[in-house]
Amino acid sequence: MSRVGKSIIKLPAKVEVKADAEALTIKGPLGELKTPIYEGVSANVENGELVFTRKSEDQKTVALHGLVRSLAMNCVKGVTSGWEKNLEITGVGYRAQKRGKDLVMALGYSHEVVFPEPNGIKIEVADQLKIKVSGIDRQLVGQVAADIRSKRPPEPYKGKGIKYQNEYIRRKAGKTGKK
């Protein structure tokens, strides 16, 4: 039995769920998300609770049972409170700023790095060294944060670059001089 799949999702008062054979549509105060329901798994809304059941006990269906439930839970949390990822910039002369809908970063290259803000995502720059990526779709928020981080990932010697908040960067010792 999938322990994740069999747990029930309690729906907040402001959330509305429509389930059909192929997809789950979840509406909340922050927006609307759609998540797929895979073959062998069905969803039912009963008394303000979202319950997932599976039709067989084969390994693939058991795995998809937990996956569908997790994706639905991410959507419910997304439309009620949203998701966010925080990034930090470390390095002399490295900084970020918003210019219209674009995130413009100086990352030690000969040119500025311009990152356009995708639809459904809000990018904020608190001071020049902190970037906050937020939105209702957890997968999209994580992907956009990873794309921003990939513009200058942290290096192991001084830790310069863009890293997630609370990310640990393994440091390496520099060269030891000639003796």
UniProtKB/Swiss-Prot annotation:
Coiled-coil region: none
One cellular-component annotation, GO: cytosolic large ribosomal subunit
Entries under SUPFAM superfamilies matching the protein: Ribosomal protein L6 (SSF56053)
Pfam families: Ribosomal_L6
UniProt-listed GO biological process terms: cytoplasmic translation
Keyword Metal-binding: no
UniProt keyword annotation of rRNA-binding present: yes
Keywords carried by this UniProt record: Ribonucleoprotein, Ribosomal protein, RNA-binding, rRNA-binding
GO terms of molecular function: rRNA binding; structural constituent of ribosome
InterPro entries hit by this protein: Ribosomal_uL6-like, Ribosomal_uL6-like_a/b-dom_sf, Ribosomal_uL6_a/b-dom, Ribosomal_uL6_bac-type, Ribosomal_uL6_CS
Family: Belongs to the universal ribosomal protein uL6 family.
Subunit structure: Part of the 50S ribosomal subunit.
Function: This protein binds to the 23S rRNA, and is important in its secondary structure. It is located near the subunit interface in the base of the L7/L12 stalk, and near the tRNA binding site of the peptidyltransferase center.
Protein name per Swiss-Prot or TrEMBL: Large ribosomal subunit protein uL6
Gene: rplF
